Amino acid sequence: MMVAISAPGWKPCPVVISDWRRRPLAPWICRTFGPVTETALGHVQVIGGGPGGLTAAALLRQACPDVEVVVYERNSQRSTFGFGVVFSAATMRGLAAAAPQVHAELTARAVSWDTVELRLRGEVHRCGGNRMSAIARRDLLDVLESWAVDVGVVVNHSSSIEEIPPGAGLTVVASGANSIFRDRAAEQLEASYTEADARYIWCGTEARFDGLTFPFVSTDAGVFGAHAYPISEGLSTFIVECDEATWRAAGLDASDVSQSPGASDEYSLGVLADVFAESLGGRPLLGNSSRWGRFRTRRARRWVTGAVAFIGDAVHTAHFSVGSGTKMAMEDAIALAEAVRVCDSVPAALERFQHDRIHQVDRLQQLASTSLDWWEHFGVLHERLAPWQFAVNFFTRSVTVGDLEQRDPAFIEAARAVWRAGSGGHAVLDTPLATAAGTAIRRVGRFDGTVARMPGVELRDQPGVRIVRDSSAATRRRRAEQARFDGQVAVLVEPCRPSVDLDDLAETLVLSGRADLVAFEADGHLT
């Protein structure tokens, strides 16, 4: 479900927030930490008072009220950066189970939707069944801090911690993507990051959007795309992305280097407000330390060293097109508290937390990597694909046509209808592919790694034909797309996996414009 908090000056309602101890708690919170006694846990400290750190602190204190829990936050109480936070329905369900009163407080101020909208070249394409939630970051922090303080957590603002204080039974590091503690422990954690080539800038606007909306605009400099969603009655998040060439051609690189630390790039905000004037209704873009950056995907093979657990952006990030770092950090916090509950020692709890949560985050990062690759190259897709096919391509960045059909059958049927209208009434996988030999191909007979053989014809790498295989899925499919744009027949070779519906994947790749012909390879043979 979608959640949004509105009034900037809102304070949590006392009847909900102030009497946590007298209200029924979630079933697992009512129990103790099991064999991990309060004495063994001793003192808990959390470095970082963002949503992940506050959630961890409140859950640990609430479950074990005699344990001292202290949060150190470097910023003052009312300062925050950014605009809104997006949650999935699954995240909200997890929060409801862990902290039902907090969930209720947020939901009561919700802005909900499940339809995602694309705007490009004068057309609008919508796909439903995408349940999410969004909230103003300042309001989220107000709710979480009130909860934490009310259950007995000590929150110290304006506390810049340079060294981890000794003596705690458990330390939770939730100090964000620029964590100095992660950097110091990088070798033990096996921490690394990769940086994208494309540019993005995080803004706000008073323009109203009904739900998650993606406007795309072609300019003389190149194509700009935006992620927009409401976070309150009068405020929306507005994130703009473009490739490096577009950023430079628009002259946005010159303004970036002149900005002082912490300032917003007002020149870029003005340029982008003009670019997206139609979607913004002529309203300006608002800054809050809004600067151009390149997205960094952070990973770590370990999240624990000694009695220190790292959560959130300090050890993992995923591109915001598939999920927010805030929601991932809060999910980490819930998982950490649950691990402490069921394990017989702090070391065992930290190992369980690390093992279980790393696998969950790995899966999300794989999806995010594919989506990030799409956002690195969306400009050429915008210019070369018809709007309906661009929409299919966009919505199948990380899922298949079959997945979308379960969410919104009408969206997929509309795309198939356009396909049939342009292919003589053929369904996607029954559409013949004409060859120079005069043969109409519907199904590949055999693929031996270099040649796709059908009765009466062979397709191999040659002028006019491109067989694309190996490399990562995102790179492979992007190369096939480019081959099509260059006027070649793109034969996309995909690995055959038992869990994959081959017809569903083939239809996805063809209907989205990624390939003309799809072969599935298992030990060099079609399966």
What do the predicted segments below correspond to?
Residues 7-10, 14-43, 62-66, 433-462, ...:
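Extreme N-terminal leader/targeting segments of oxidoreductases
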Residues 25-28, 34-40, 338-464:
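C-terminal helical "tail/cap" subdomain of flavin- and related membrane-associated enzymes
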Residues 37-41, 88-202, 421-428:
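Conserved N-terminal helical subregion
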Residues 46-62, 203, 291-370:
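Conserved mid-domain beta->alpha element of the FAD-binding
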Residues 52, 77, 178:
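Conserved Rossmann-like nucleotide-cofactor binding loop
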Residues 61-81:
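Glycine-rich FAD pyrophosphate-binding loop
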Residues 76-94:
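Conserved N-terminal glycine-rich FAD pyrophosphate-binding loop of Rossmann-like flavoproteins
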Residues 127-130, 212-294:
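Conserved FAD/dinucleotide-binding core of flavoprotein oxidoreductases
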